[in-house]
């Protein structure tokens, strides 16, 4: 079913959900059906290559998912889907042109992701003492990976756009600890996403503050390897964060040209993200003279 039809059908179900229910069981079934449908919309969107279509449809989808969370606020799968959706919209379509709005979107993603983490059993991630926080991470297992990874990813995205806030930066050690736990549990999870995060972190941190460019390179290359070269955003970030920092124009251009030479649908479920990677790669190449 096309994305726009899925959204239209989901809209009708949202209306039903929010009307006073004569039968509690009926409402529960409708909520469950809509939650499943919204996940289907997300999956269908990630197979799209039409960035304009997805960009224009996302605000409606986000409003729908907000309505669903309002109806079933303790559904952890719905919460994590909402977090992923807000973070993906911010990073893929908004961040490069409107950082203030992207920060607002990431704040929503962070809120949903932390709520999902709590519903999954990890209580008070913001306020519990750090030693207790780390002990809690050690109790998390493979089954907890989606909640752990996406909470850390959304939280980290919010911090990256909020670096002027000392309070936000003080939360970074918690995110790093979460990503390190992801690496311990399964370094290949989400195309080596934790390695990608650590690569960006090491490359972005000044050497005087402990950043290690060689370690950043190792993390980026491991992420690319674990994604079998199909997750093109890993290569875009490698060029943007490592090659630029290393002042290696040849590597910068070669990496981005490799991205553009790889079909977006090399992995169907990554078509949208790879199309975004193509767009970002073209922009970075056009701006190369500004960096080197």
Question: What do these predicted regions represent?
Answer:
Residues 187-188:
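Membrane-interfacial loop-to-helix junctions in multi-pass transporters
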């Amino acid at each position: 079913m096309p994305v726009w039809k899925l959204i239209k059908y989901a809209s009708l179900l949202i209306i039903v959900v929010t009307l006073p229910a004569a039968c509690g069981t009926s409402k529960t079934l409708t909520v469950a059906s809509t939650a499943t449908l919204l996940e289907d919309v997300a999956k269908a969107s990630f197979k799209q290559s039409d960035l304009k279509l997805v960009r224009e449809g996302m605000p409606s989808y986000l409003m729908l998912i907000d309505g669903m969370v309002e109806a079933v606020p303790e559904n952890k799968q719905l919460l994590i889907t909402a977090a992923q959706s807000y973070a993906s919209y911010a990073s893929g379509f908004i961040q490069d042109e409107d950082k203030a709005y992207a920060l607002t979107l990431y704040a929503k993603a962070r809120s949903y992701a932390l709520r999902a983490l709590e519903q999954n059993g990890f209580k008070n991630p913001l306020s519990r003492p750090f030693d207790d926080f780390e002990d809690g991470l050690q109790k998390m297992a493979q089954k907890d990976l989606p909640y752990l990874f996406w909470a850390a990813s959304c939280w980290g995205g919010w911090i990256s756009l909020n670096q002027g806030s000392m309070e936000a930066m003080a939360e970074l050690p918690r995110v790093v600890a979460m990503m390190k736990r992801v690496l311990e549990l399964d370094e290949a999870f989400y195309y080596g996403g934790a390695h990608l995060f650590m690569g960006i972190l090491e490359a972005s941190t000044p050497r005087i503050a402990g950043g290690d460019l060689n370690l950043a390179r190792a993390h980026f290359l491991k992420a690319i390897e674990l994604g079998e070269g199909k997750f093109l955003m890993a290569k875009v970030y490698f060029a943007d964060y490592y090659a630029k920092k290393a002042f290696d124009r040849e590597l910068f251009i070669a990496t981005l040209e490799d991205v553009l030479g790889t079909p977006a649908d090399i992995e169907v479920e990554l078509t949208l993200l790879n199309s975004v990677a193509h767009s970002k790669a073209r922009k970075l190449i056009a701006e190369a003279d500004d960096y080197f």
